[in-house]
Amino acid sequence: MICINCCCHVESLYVAYPGDHIRLTDCWQCGEVVDRYVEFDNVLLFIDLLLLKPGAYRHLVYNSLEVDMRRYPEHGTRESGFRGYVQDWLLWFRKYDRLNRIWLLLITFEVYLMWMTEEKKYNNYYREPATQYGWHLLTGDVLSLQNPLLQYLFFAVYVIGDLALLHKLTRESLLNWSQWGQDLRYAKDIVSYTILLSYGAKIFPILMLIWPYDSLVSTSIIKWIANFYIVESLRIVTSKSYSYIILLFAGIFIVRSVVLKPVLALIVSRGNMLQAQRYLWGEYELFKFRFLTKRDIFL
């Protein structure tokens, strides 16, 4: 646990007295209350998260998370074999039950939003040049499928793969390359929780189902804002410089773009290398077309 003001380590957040009374602990270094969000309502905490208040993020990813993690053993069972394997998995599901449910909700919304956005982008912007120049586009062939379930599965794989790469690369970069969090007990969980909290901004376009307007432009703006949320939240939690976080995020974006599309092309083409190459060439030509014509490049 840490002081949300100066980030120094502390032993406790408050002292409990009879009658459910508590006294918040003062920080030995800065003299401020260690974590004033202990007494905050969840609604006020959520508002401060939206406003990117550093204290709100530090309260959740450091203090609140550690309190939850301490309820469970840090390591799995010592039993070997299939029984021990099953018990470890059950412990993992209990330990991360709340976080997993939030992830499932976010992914479900993100899949639907991507499906809706990609369909509109293809019909409004990509179909005409693809037909004119004979490009084979992943999105076009997937949206032409008659089975909606297959379309949904494609975008589900897209979202989950994209999120998995973001999550894995961010953790590896911070924990192994920059050696951040060496003195933290739950460093991996802290990074994961930070990504979860900031990633939630990506589902705000779901409100456009209630109040329709120029959805493509608005969705793109919100996605750029969500990317800013991720950068800012990682800076708050890790205390790294903006230049480091932006460089890290740019590198991860490039890796995600290079890795994910070829994998999806192989899946859609069912392992047909020639067809997969056509998809990748079509995506490359589309990117060049958008860049050279400066058409919907930020959508």
UniProtKB/Swiss-Prot annotation:
Glycans are attached at residue 176. It is a multi-pass membrane protein. One of its GO terms (biological process) is intracellular sterol transport. This is Protein ARV1. Coiled coil: none annotated. InterPro entries: Arv1 (IPR007290). GO terms for cellular component: cortical endoplasmic reticulum; endoplasmic reticulum membrane; Golgi apparatus; Golgi membrane. It comes from Eremothecium gossypii (strain ATCC 10895 / CBS 109.51 / FGSC 9923 / NRRL Y-1056) (Yeast). Keywords: Endoplasmic reticulum, Glycoprotein, Golgi apparatus, Lipid metabolism, Lipid transport, Membrane, Sphingolipid metabolism, Transmembrane, Transmembrane helix, Transport. It is found in: Endoplasmic reticulum membrane; Golgi apparatus membrane. Belongs to the ARV1 family. The chain crosses the membrane at residues 99-116, 149-169, 190-210, 211-231, 245-265. Mediator of sterol homeostasis involved in sterol uptake, trafficking and distribution into membranes. Also regulates the sphingolipid metabolism.
